[in-house]
Amino acid sequence: MNVERKLESLSLQQQQQEEQQDESEQPNQGVEDEEEEEYDEEEYEEEEEDINFSKETLEAAMATKVSIEQYYTSLFKSLKERDDRRCFLEKKMEELNLREEQKSVKRRELDKKETEYIKSRRIRLTGHSFESIRIIGRGAFGEVRLVKMKKNNKFFAMKKLDKSKMIEKHQTIHVRSERDILADSNNIHGSNPWIVSLYYSFQDANFLYLIMEYVPGGDMMTQLIKYDTFTEDATRFYIAETVLALHSIHKLSYIHRDIKPDNLLIDQKGHIKVSDFGLCTGLQTNRVPTLAEIYKKYEGDNNIREEDQTPQSRSARFDSWKRQRRVLAYSNVGTPDYTAPEVLMKDGYSAECDWWSVGVIMFEMLVGYPPFCSESIRETYHKIMNWKQTLPKIMEEAKAEVNLSPEAQDLIERFLTDPMTRIGFNGVEEIQSHPFFKGVDWRRLRETRPPIIPQLSSPTDTSNFDHYEEEQQPEPMQPVQSKSRRKITSFDIPFIGYTYRNFDAMRDAFGSVNSRDAFGSINSREAFGSINNRDSLQGANM
C-alpha cells in the first residue's frame, strides 16, 4: 500500500509540474503566435501592394457593379409594379361588383397584357424609330423635336441630349433626375395631369433620348412676351394651376427648384403642365448641386451696386427684358431671376423655395417683368441676395405703374419673404385659403375654361413655338453596341439604367391588343388607371 501511495504521490507531483510547465510556456507560445501573425500580415500587405489593376479593369469592375445594382433594383421594382397592377385590378373589380366569370376574363386579359409588355421590352428603340417633323426647342445641351413614331403614327416631343456635353459640364446627375421624376410621376392610377408624360427613354453611343408628351400650346414665356401682362383673373387661374402642379411634385418628395415661365407648358386645352426637371431634387437629399455653384463667378460683396444700369421706365424695362429673355433661356448659365435666395446661398432649403418662384412669376404676370430683373446677371443676383432692401422699393414702383389689388400685393409679398414665414410653409392649404384666390374651385380647376386656349390647325401645328433652323443634317445614329463588341468605360457609367418604357405606351405601339378593347366596355384609363413600368437593364440597352 505504501508503494502505491508513493506512486500516486509521485504521479500527482509530476502532473503538477507539467501543469506549471505548461503555464510557463503559454506566454512564450503566445508571443510566437503574435510574431507569426505580424509576419503574416506584413507578408500579406507586401503581396497586396504588388497587385495593380489597370484603368480598364477598374472601369469594367465599376460598370459591372453598377449594372448589377441597376438590374436587380429594376427587376424587383418591376415585380412590385406588376403585383400592384394585379391588386389594383382586383380592387376595381370589387368596386364594380363584377361576377366571378367576368373577373376571370379580366384577369386573363391582364395576364395577356403583361406577356405582351414583356415581349415588347425586347424591342430596341432608336432615333430611327421616329420621324422628325421640326425643332421646337434648343438649349445648351441639346434640342427638342416634334417627332412621329413610325410604328403607330403618334406624335411626341423628343428631347435629345449630348452625352459628352453633359459630362463636360457635370450635368449627368441633372439629366438622371429629370428622367427619374418623369418616370415616378406615372403610376397605376395614371399619369400626373400636371406633369409632362414620359413614354420612353433610351440612348445610343452619343446621345440620350426622352420621348415625351407633345404639349402644343408652347410655354408661358411665349404668352407673356405676346401679351406683356395678364389680368388679375388670368393670373389667378395660372398661379392656382401652378400651385397645384407644384404641390403634386412635392407629394412625390421632389423639389423642382427651377420653376419659371419657360417650364410651364400649355396643353391643347389651355391648362398648365410642368416640364424641365433637370434641377429637380429630392426633399431629403443633397445629390443635386446648389445653383450657387452656377452663379459663383457672379458673387462679390453683399452690397448692391451703387449704379444700377436697369432702365427706370416700365416700357424700357419691357424692351430690355424681352430682348434678353430668350438668350438667357438657352444659355449655359440661364437666369437667376426666379430662384429663391436660399438656393443661391447654399443654405438649407426645402419645398418652400418653389413658392418663392411662384411669387416672382405672379409679379411678372401682373407687372410685365420679374421683380429683380436687371441689365446683367450680376445685378440680378445681388438684388435677390439683398431682397429685404430691394423688394420694398420694387413693390412701390410697381404699384405706381400698375393697379395691383391689395390681395395681389399681399400674396406676392408673402411669397417673396423668408422661408420660415413664406406662405406655403405650413402646407398648400395656406396658399389656397389666401383672399386672392377667393372663388377658385380648386377641385375642378382643370375643368375650368382657361383664359388662353391654343388655336391649332393640325396635330403638327408648332405655331406656338419659336422657329429654329436646322444647323446641320441630323447626325447618324450610333447604336449602343453589345458588351462583346464594345467595352463599357467610365463614360457610360452615369447612363447605365437610363432606359424606361411606359407600360401602356409600349403595348399601344408594339402590342396586339388595344388596352380599351381589352377591358370591353370599361375604359381602362378611367376604371383601371394608366399602368406603367420601368424597363430593367437589358444587356447593352443600359
From Swiss-Prot:
Residues 438-510 form the AGC-kinase C-terminal domain. Its EC number is 2.7.11.1. It is an enzyme of class 2 (transferase). The gene is ndrB. The active site is at D258. It is found in: Cytoplasm. Signal peptide: none annotated. GO terms for molecular function: ATP binding; protein serine kinase activity; protein serine/threonine kinase activity. Gene3D superfamilies: Phosphorylase Kinase, domain 1, Transferase(Phosphotransferase) domain 1. ATP binds at I136, G137, R138, G139, A140, F141, G142, E143, V144, K159. The keyword Transferase applies. It comes from Dictyostelium discoideum. GO terms for cellular component: cytoplasm. Its main location: cytoplasm. Residues 455-465 have a biased composition (Polar residues). Residues 130-437 form the Protein kinase domain. Residues 9-18 have a biased composition (Low complexity). The keyword Cytoplasm applies. InterPro entries: AGC-kinase_C, Kinase-like_dom_sf, Pkinase_C, Prot_kinase_dom, Protein_kinase_ATP_BS, Rho-assoc_Ser/Thr_Kinase, Ser/Thr_kinase_AS. Keywords: ATP-binding, Cytoplasm, Kinase, Nucleotide-binding, Phosphoprotein, Serine/threonine-protein kinase, Transferase. This is Probable serine/threonine-protein kinase ndrB. Residues 1-52, 452-486 are annotated as: Disordered. Belongs to the protein kinase superfamily. AGC Ser/Thr protein kinase family. It catalyses: L-seryl-[protein] + ATP = O-phospho-L-seryl-[protein] + ADP + H(+); L-threonyl-[protein] + ATP = O-phospho-L-threonyl-[protein] + ADP + H(+). Residues 19-51 have a biased composition (Acidic residues). Pfam families: Pkinase (PF00069), Pkinase_C (PF00433).
